[in-house]
Amino acid sequence: MHKDCDKRFFKKPEFYRLTGGNNYVRIDAEDKVTGRGKYAGDFYLPGMLTAKMVRSTHAHAKILSIDTSEAEKLPGVKAILTAKDFKWPGKLGNAEFAVEFADREVLVTDKVRRIGDDIAAVAAIDEETAQKAVDLIKVEYEDIPAVFDPFEAMEDGAPWVNGAPDTHNVGMATFRKGGTDPDEEFANAAFVYKEDYETHRMVHAAIEPHAATANYENGVYTIWMSTQLCFVDQYWYSHAMGVDPEKIRVIKPLVGGGFGGKMDSYSFGIVAAKLSEMTSRPVRMVLTREEVFQMCANRHPIYVHVETAHDKDGRLLAKRARHILDGGPYGGTGVAACAQSTIWACLPYKMRSVDVEARRVYTNNPHAGAMRGYTSCQIHFCHDVHMQLASEAMGIDPVDFRRMSVADPGYETPSGIKVTSCASKQCLDTVRKEIHWDERKDNLADGEGIGFAASGFVSGTGFPILDTPNRSSASVVVKINKLGHVTVYTGANDIGMGSDTAMTAIVAEELGLTLENTTTVVSDTHITPFDSGSYGSRVTFLSGNAARRAAVDAKQKLFEVIGPMWGVMPHTLECLEGKVISKQRADLQMPFRDAVFKWMAINGGDELTGVGSYSHEGTTAQYNSTSDDSKENFAPAYSFSASAAHVTVDKETGCIDIDDFVFAHDCGRALNRRAVEGQLEGSIGMGVGYTCFEHNITKDGKILNPNFRDYRFPTALDMPKMRTYYDFPADEEGPFGAKECGEGSAAPVAPAIANAIHSATGIKITKLPLDPEHIWRMLNGMEDDRHSK
């Protein structure tokens, strides 16, 4: 950023034109709908080979031998890769932050820990030949005892899966404590409620499967990959291959959905790169749908115990909670899930004391990692259903019960979370009004119910993966040519949510231009500036602030030339509707292009460049907080949501209809209303799937429904009437007042539906999913003995 760039040069709200009340089309929309856009599996390079992987068919076993001799004889096979081809250290991840980040080999050497572990890879002239070669490779195993239940995995004498042998398979533990003495709060409370809850495994099910195309040339590995973390992948791959990061170039093309599933430490990209080096030809690998289900990260099943203490009016005083996460056999980005789960236990409700403990346990189940909301969907289901049951036990209206305890602006949690802008009460008031709760609550028919939920989420997570030890960061560069056209260089990873458009709009707004005047160059580790990646709702807030600062930097440099020409102070100028204007004299204005040309004439013809970066100084975030008095603020801002669901339950069959869903989300100032509505409706859709349809059914570590035929999604016919509300106060720290809207909005869907089913039937709901069989069994007094694993 320009050394003299200051707040005086930031555009004031009265000059906003593009963001806020407008709907504008995404800059990648035409390429996507016409098929011109390229995804990682769409690249066809001369001489390109196809790669396939040999994967473990055993959940826990020693590898005695790998025989590739028959595959090597097959015509068309160009290379076969095994662990012996990786010199040092051959592991993916970043052990600098947590050793559990780097507990996974690129290709397994001597022990498989799950079905689907990567053992070997083949590069061949086409997919059919590659698959034949994979089938010819013989792997000899010796089975060893496996463990699939996280509670059994923590017992003495349980099979050791991963991590240090003396940790009882606990890969990560986080303790979130603070405030007054919890024992005293519970002892003196007017009412205490306790319950156990359980959530299930779910897959991201992005339309695009994971894919990579790699080309090794002139000593550089270039990898086009479906990823959420191109700079992180560059570092992880260089670490695993023992080469300098500059020798690895990761480019993120269009990505057909991520939802957290494309940010873990996978092998397919590095394997394609290594095979390209071995063959001196480009190599492409596209995972099958079955591979994505079994090998890629799923949503964590979590087992939760919650205790809450309340005063006589129902106000929340204190909370104790224990979270057990089934992480599968590896850490990866799932390491952060443990700490994240403790954050959601502290939001959105105020309390004087909190004591939350989370343990992520290694098992031989499929690997679990990040998924939209990073455990918030699971934790808010458990904790908000708990609030519903507690309100009923105390005989208090469920909305009033929540409203008296939700956070207010300026609230600081006992664990150190600092709430700034906050419309949680307004969100609850909105859904209460729009679902007509007060008129309908005493007039619901048999089998008809209304349920509510509230939640909170980070906006711009402080959890790092690469850069500073306790904060994530973003940088953006803006270049303006002699014609006044702007190019935005950002390392932010758009995975389908429209962040490229957001970055463009933020820069265009600050410079008083339209989207047509702006081009974006994104996510190329050799061209674009560093960005931590797409996770934790950080892109709009962190990368967006960096983009705005880059535009302000360029604008300030421009004004410091034009201002003296006009005899006015530089900070009294503004960019508006394609012109540079004086805010004080209407007669002083100039086309933006002409102003840039004058700047270049004075500065030797160089492009006008602005640089911006953002990392919130007040943010701290650790993966394994263990101190009783540690206080951590995880983000510069937090979003808040409330939802209301109206359902009808057929008590004969257990089938439910979600008739109406009202959603209010405090996302600050909406930059693009159409995009916000799409994110909120998408969150409802994914939440309906998580609650009522989608379930990765596993047996002995094997997913039994690893395809779109057997894994049930909600269709358009299953979706409720959706009404979304998001006009709430701007956040002072967010770019043009914006906060997140794509992840936190998924969290209150499941508890609202569960609470509505409880309202309609009276059955106590403590487990997901809520499919017809599950509901029918409970309606008929049968014990729900299904297990999330």
Where are these regions (language model features)?
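Extended active-site and interfacial segments that coordinate phosphate-rich ligands
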Residues: 27-31, 135-144, 235, 239-240, ...
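Flexible, low-hydrophobicity surface segments
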Residues: 1-171, 462
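Helix-loop-helix junctions that connect adjacent transmembrane helices in secondary transporters/permeases
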Residues: 159-241, 406-485, 704-718, 723-725
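Thiamine diphosphate
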Residues: 235, 254, 258-280, 284-286, ...
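Short beta-strand elements
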Residues: 31, 211-216, 303-312, 318-323, ...
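C-terminal catalytic domains of large/alpha subunits in multi-subunit enzymes
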Residues: 83-84, 242-247, 277-283, 312, ...
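Glycine-rich loop/linker segments at domain edges
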Residues: 22, 27-34, 96-98, 102, ...
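Catalytic phosphate/nucleotide-handling subdomain of diverse soluble enzymes
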Residues: 459-461, 466-528, 542
